[in-house]
Amino acid sequence: MMEPKSIFLLGLLLFRVGKLMRNDKLAWSAEYEAKKFKFYHNTSLFLTLQSTGPEMTNLCKKSWCDKVDDYFVVPHHYVNWQKPTEQWLIHHFSKMILHTRRLPQQAQWYMFAFDNNYFFVERLIKELSKFDSHLPIYTILRDFHADIQHKPVLIFSRSALNTFYDLEEENCSENAENVEEWLTTCMSIPPITISVDRSKKSRIFAIKRHFQVDEMKTMPNDYHDDKDYIHRHSSSLLSFTNLSLEDLKLLPIFVEKVQGGYKKKAASKILF
Amino acid sequence: MISLLLVFLSQISLILGAPQTILCLIHTATPSHETRAKTILETWVQHCDDFLFFTDSKMNDSIPHIYYPLLNSRDHSWEKIRRVFKYVRDKITKKYDWYYRADDDTYALMHNMRTLLDNYSPTKHHYLGLQWNFFTPRGFNDGSSYILSRPTMEAFNEVMLDPDRCPDHHRAEEDQELAKCLAHMEIYPEDIRDEMGSERIQHFHPLEQLTIYKDTFNRRLAYYPAMKEDENFSDKMISFHHVSPYEMRLMDYIFYRLDKP
């Protein structure tokens, strides 16, 4: 028969061990964001967001991230601060995807993105709802009109995620040239395409030049306003990507707050 | 009798319901003809009823413009705007309800301007813009973007004839001089902030506007206190200032092409 004092100490020890096991530091082999994950049912979209810095991530959280069903933020100190290569992206996306096995949720779709994005979440969910999440479906979102390197966004159905878990060890060599090649080989099926509209305009808009004071000084010679590039993008945009901090400060205001207008007939010339 | 009354009422309703017309006057200069002016021409100015660039050298004949080769520096602004409004009154046959003057680094949302102007009678004196609290007792509207009703434009032309009340001298700050002249006609800036107290017209770049409430100059000289961060942007913004042609294109895409779900 144990003494009450021993029982108390044992109980305290068990409590502390239990707390330690729930500690986020053990789960991801590093730190989690301090966020509790709730069990939910019939959830559409779960986001794993790679932070590149607290300011960027907070701006995402205040705007579009709030519209997904739930999200998890990977801390920013796991990001290679040099310009990420495709090989680094492959390796990091692999870790992000595999990590979802540890999360207690049952979403229909899983998105993996960096925090330099601004998504039109309602439109994205509407697009995804056209597909059966019980099928192994995945997509890679990139702006194929952009001639700049930028990070893609990956979206998997629940079924595709399970396929990735199963095939990851056998098929998913990280020696591919790019994310597209890596995933197509890994999954043994090609991705679906939702990143272009019927007019072949891109629904992903990679921002090449950023909002800044004195923007004209960034192009002192042969300045142009990039009209052609901008007009190559769809009106039914899914996201802006490759955003700077300044872009993320202004885009929510322009998109969500300020009321836009509609095309009016062209102004006539003044008759003298 | 009844039919006459019905015809009369229908005519009244036509007059009252007729959309207000706006002539846009854009200040540019030779170095900006192929950049700023070109972008404005292809974007927001198309939403004006008519427009006229005023500059210091000839533009393409297809672009409505007037130019003053001898008034080719910023310090000539006051002389230029006097001549522009005189030209508008004397040489342009069409009568507009409103006259909107803008810089060539301004991006305007004309549909929001029309919504604002629906609250004002174009037959009365109105002088609308972003108000500063210095130079004249009741302040002046920022030169980047301001709106005059037709009677105000006429009053300006009238007071210009009086060199004591509205002298023609060499000065860059045409916005201040305009306010001083209009004050002699008892026309003063009006409060056009929205119901939340946010300005509809901005002077500084949008990024600077996010923190302008901290700026010493603005705190001291703005007529109304600036709101903080995104509250500083009205949902019915009329114009942004200090934006580049690229930023104008991107904003034009966001405001006029992008379907917002």
Curated annotation (Swiss-Prot), chain A:
Gene Ontology molecular-function annotations: glycoprotein-N-acetylgalactosamine 3-beta-galactosyltransferase activity
Keywords: Signal
Signal peptide, first to last residue: 1-20
Superkingdom field: Eukaryota
Name the record gives this protein: Uncharacterized protein F37A4.3
Originating organism: Caenorhabditis elegans
Record lineage: Eukaryota, Metazoa, Ecdysozoa, Nematoda, Chromadorea
